[in-house]
């Protein structure tokens, strides 16, 4: 399990399904068994407290995203003074209710993602090997960037302003990191490509990962107008 301390009131963690099983829980427990799901989340809170001294005081706000290989959870302490004065029992009850609501929402999102993964896998198989697809793009120009997390991908999808539609794009994921590759048609002006790259860097970062590396080691999770698909499956994030 990877834990990131965002600030004094917020932590973010990513845990793979293998890690979940190593802790004595199954993937099915997490989504279908209320008691086991709550037990799992409280065990995570104990571990977060030990590593980051993140003591549960009052109600918590949690956000869950399910991925093919694991779960990303953002946990924030409430800053509302009235809610901070809640009793421990009331805070625990509210947290449990939030856990169940978010588990239900996450399960729906996970089902959608799994359907999307299956769809993309079929598309790749029908199109042939990834290396053949790369060679077919020899007359295109490609830029690749790295997103730190899913939230950055979502922000780009909702706030980008494409300069051209003459491109193909792919969203990869490897080791919990997202990579976005854009293949511009050969006749697209270099200035347009440069402007598109500059716009991407408002939300993402340069990377030395190549398309060959991504095709060999990463998983394509979205393709063909990635931003539209992200907006379809995920709501806009708020500050």
UniProtKB/Swiss-Prot annotation:
Classify the source by domain of life: Bacteria
What's this chain's function?
A: Enables the recognition and targeting of unfolded and aggregated proteins to the ClpC protease or to other proteins involved in proteolysis.
Region (Disordered) location: 118-137
Concerning its family, UniProt says:
Belongs to the MecA family.
User: Which segments cross the bilayer?
Assistant: none
For this protein, the record's InterPro entries field holds: MecA_C_sf, Neg-reg_MecA
Q: What residue stretch is flagged as signal peptide?
A: none
Instruction: Provide any one GO MF term from the record.
Output: protein-macromolecule adaptor activity
- Comp. bias intervals (Basic and acidic residues): 118-128
- The protein's gene is named mecA
Comment text on domains: The N-terminal domain probably binds unfolded/aggregated proteins; the C-terminal domain interacts with ClpC.
**What is the official name of this protein in its record?**
Adapter protein MecA
| Pfam family for this entry, one | MecA
Describe the protein's quaternary organization and the partners it interacts with: Homodimer.
